[in-house]
């Protein structure tokens, strides 16, 4: 399951960041200065909807919940896996440019910089990236009652077809080992979200990585 999510979001990140490659420091001195300053990542205006909740079904008994506010500047992703003999729930709180991840019932988690892609609209990527990942615009399609943009791409040996609405993933189909693995929204709720869900949990220590 983690491989599926990695494949989609890695491709999304690469495409979204493709236009900023030329802004990287060209010299070692410039690189050092940038590292020392360590600016906090800025995450804003990622989605075309201010706030909401989306529930997903995924392979291997996996369910996911996405809570977001301030147009995606802060969000919480809860991933629950039920294999019958074992159950796990991981929570990822993303806000203020950082991602805080921990597993339910544990007292330690991790904190790292959150460099979220500003867009999942592949058509906005530069031509070289579009060619490298064989990105194709497949038009639009109604998924879960939403008019979604549809794209196909290839990340490594895993072809991906994705549907997004207001820059939010609604469905993805990843082909791995000849089988289709589907992540799809089952319920979409527009509207306000309880701000408490974005609070860091008491009793959990986050180690920065």
Regions of interest found by a model, annotated:
Residues 2-3, 19, 74:
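Basic side chains
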Residues 17-25:
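Bacterial lipoprotein signal-peptidase II cleavage site
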Residues 15-16, 55:
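Residues marking helix boundaries in flexible regions
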Residues 1-15:
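Sec-dependent bacterial lipoprotein signal peptides
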Residues 24-25, 33-209:
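Extended soluble regions of mature proteins
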